[in-house]
């Protein structure tokens, strides 16, 4: 038997079981848990390589072979960190295992034939496309930024740079809902829109769900009163849709206790649950410990740094149409920004009490930084708190699975779309992101939508090879023409689908139904289901979880930052 060194093997086929990989320039290290490929029978494409006729490629017809194989990929997902070939068929994930030609190779579960395209995954990390569940649809250019960061699904509301949209994630009323669904047809991104949930009577909310809303958004700028909260949740229960809430910072219509009483035991997604993005001051963070609350953060406070507090005030004044000349407006802004609760938010993420991270795009958050900010938070906690209890000193697999779940599977579960997206599992849309380890979480090397490359860094189109400068992200064929309709998905309520809305509006994209939104609970938030008793001191803003004080220092330096953006 021929022997090859681990280094030589990793250089040729990528890391295998027991090998460790550093994520970008962070202090996070993964260790490969399992290798689904077979030593000596790995498949690789290229001159003199394996995937050639009669060798790694067989004679199967298209119906019996893959459309695409990603070879020797290092997969990071909530369910594991493994090395495998990834098969794609008809725009969906066909399997994770060993690819090749079963006529001459043992253990083949994914058949390569003449109709199979190849993406070389050797040395690359593959993750599921990210899901950003807090989008203000202020401008369509957000989609390009998000896609090129590794996000493939965006959920939220808005109509463009209207004053209401600048502040709230609502697409109000059937007319605007229809127009946004029509606009979505031209965007290479899975999209779902939230209607405005602030109403004390149900009819105006029902008509928005019937018009296609995947859920309803309660926002304090429209009045998040106990009456509107109760009514909105009643409609959601009847229509199997989710409710997202930005609670009452000013405590005008009640305190956090009143909001929680209005919610009762019904499921709700609480946006920016720490409070700097808005919510009962100073103690909305208490909600993250409840069984029916699905808590998320937005990325302006991720992670806590020496600059976090300073930049928030001006952002807040602009986004919520406040006047710096009015003392009450300034006091409103200042009440939302508390060092103590932001610091506690870092730790609550690390312990799995906060379940999701999103952007709050152009409304205090940066749409292209959800993934980067998530891993910066994980790094900061590793440096400040050490390894998680279940991780040995040599790797951070538990922490890595916890943090990747925050922007993939958990928002998918929260909004009833986990049957379509959110993880690398057979049957789901092949929304996949490839990364070189040195650039992980910062700059993808390829973004697939529905099994087709939608965006990638690309060099001069007039060059003799693909790599000459200037290299920058460019749209690829999967983002163009009718191919885009076959590889992107618009999410709608079941009520809208059953009433024939896609045909009425002439929608040509894939249609996904949101479902099981009302049965999901905090316990279903994978790796992020901790439910501590949270207490906030109303004078000092100190936060305790099960009696333990939560505090940490702001970071002065972060990885995944300037060194990656010199060019």
Swiss-Prot record:
Catalytic activity field? urea + 2 H2O + H(+) = hydrogencarbonate + 2 NH4(+)
Q: Which amino acid positions bind Ni(2+) 1, per UniProt?
A: 134, 136, 217, 360
- Cofactor binding: number and manner: Binds 2 nickel ions per subunit.
SUPFAM superfamilies referenced in this protein's UniProt entry, alphabetically: Composite domain of metallo-dependent hydrolases (SSF51338), Metallo-dependent hydrolases (SSF51556)
- Enumerate the PROSITE patterns for this protein: UREASE_1 (PS01120), UREASE_2 (PS00145), UREASE_3 (PS51368)
Signal peptide positions (record):
none
Residues bearing N6-carboxylysine are 217
Q: Which GO terms describe its molecular function?
A: nickel cation binding; urease activity
Keyword Cytoplasm: yes or no?
yes
Q: Where is the active site?
A: 320
After translation, the protein is modified as follows: Carboxylation allows a single lysine to coordinate two nickel ions.
Protein location? Cytoplasm
| Alphabetical list of Gene3D superfamilies matching this protein | Metal-dependent hydrolases, Urease, subunit C, domain 1
Summarize subunit and interaction data from the UniProt record for this chain: Heterotrimer of UreA (gamma), UreB (beta) and UreC (alpha) subunits. Three heterotrimers associate to form the active enzyme.
Which protein is depicted?
Urease subunit alpha
């Amino acid at each position: 038997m021929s022997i090859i060194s681990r280094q030589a093997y990793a250089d040729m086929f990528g890391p295998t079981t027991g090998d460790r990989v550093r994520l970008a320039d962070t202090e996070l290290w993964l260790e490969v848990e399992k290798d689904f490929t077979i030593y000596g029978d790995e498949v690789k494409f290229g001159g003199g390589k394996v995937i050639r006729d009669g060798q790694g490629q067989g004679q199967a017809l298209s119906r019996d072979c893959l459309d695409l194989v990603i070879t020797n990929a290092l997969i990071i997902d909530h369910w594991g960190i493994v090395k495998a070939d990834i098969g794609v068929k008809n725009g969906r994930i066909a399997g994770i295992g060993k690819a090749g030609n079963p006529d001459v190779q043992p253990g083949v579960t994914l058949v390569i034939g003449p109709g199979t395209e190849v993406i070389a995954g050797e040395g690359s990390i593959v993750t599921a496309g990210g899901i950003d569940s807090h989008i203000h649809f202020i401008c369509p250019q957000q989609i390009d930024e998000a896609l090129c960061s590794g996000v493939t699904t965006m959920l939220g509301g808005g109509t463009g740079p209207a004053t209401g949209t600048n502040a709230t994630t609502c697409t109000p009323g059937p007319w605007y809902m229809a127009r946004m669904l029509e606009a979505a047809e031209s965007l290479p991104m899975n999209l779902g829109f939230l209607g405005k949930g602030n109403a004390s009577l149900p009819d105006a909310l029902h008509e928005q769900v019937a018009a296609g809303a995947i859920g309803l958004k309660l926002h304090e700028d429209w009045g998040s009163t106990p009456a509107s909260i109760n009514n909105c949740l009643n409609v959601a229960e009847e229509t199997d849709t989710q409710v997202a809430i930005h609670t009452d910072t000013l405590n005008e219509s009640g305190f956090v206790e009143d909001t929680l009483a209005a919610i009762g035991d019904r499921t709700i997604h609480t946006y920016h649950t720490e409070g700097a993005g808005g919510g009962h001051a100073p103690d909305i963070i208490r909600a993250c410990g409840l069984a029916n609350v699905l808590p998320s953060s937005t990325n302006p406070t991720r992670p806590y740094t020496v600059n976090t507090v300073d930049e928030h005030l001006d952002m807040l004044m602009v986004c919520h149409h406040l006047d710096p000349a009015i003392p009450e407006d300034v006091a409103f802004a200042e009440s939302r920004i508390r060092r103590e609760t932001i610091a506690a938010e870092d730790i609550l993420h690390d312990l799995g009490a906060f379940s999701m991270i999103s952007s709050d795009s152009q409304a205090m958050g940066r749409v292209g930084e959800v993934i980067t900010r998530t891993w910066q938070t994980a790094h900061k906690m590793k440096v400040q708190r050490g390894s998680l209890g279940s991780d040995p000193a040599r790797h951070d697999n538990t922490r890595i699975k916890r943090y990747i779940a925050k922007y993939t599977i958990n928002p998918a579960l929260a909004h009833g779309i986990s049957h379509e997206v959110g993880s690398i599992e057979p049957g789901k849309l092949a929304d996949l992101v490839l990364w070189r380890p040195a650039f992980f979480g910062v700059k993808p090397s390829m973004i697939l939508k529905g099994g087709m490359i939608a965006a990638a860094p690309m060099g001069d189109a007039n060059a003799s090879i693909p790599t000459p400068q200037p290299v920058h992200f460019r749209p690829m064929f999967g983002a163009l023409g009718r191919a885009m309709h076959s590889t992107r998905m618009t999410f709608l309520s079941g009520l809208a689908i059953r009433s024939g809305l896609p045909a009425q509006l002439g929608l040509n994209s894939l249609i996904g139904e949101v479902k099981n939104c009302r049965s999901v609970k905090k316990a279903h938030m994978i790796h992020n289901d901790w439910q501590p008793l949270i207490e906030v001191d109303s004078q000092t803003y100190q936060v305790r979880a099960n009696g333990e004080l939560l505090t940490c220092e702001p970071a002065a330096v972060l990885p995944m930052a300037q060194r990656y953006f010199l060019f």
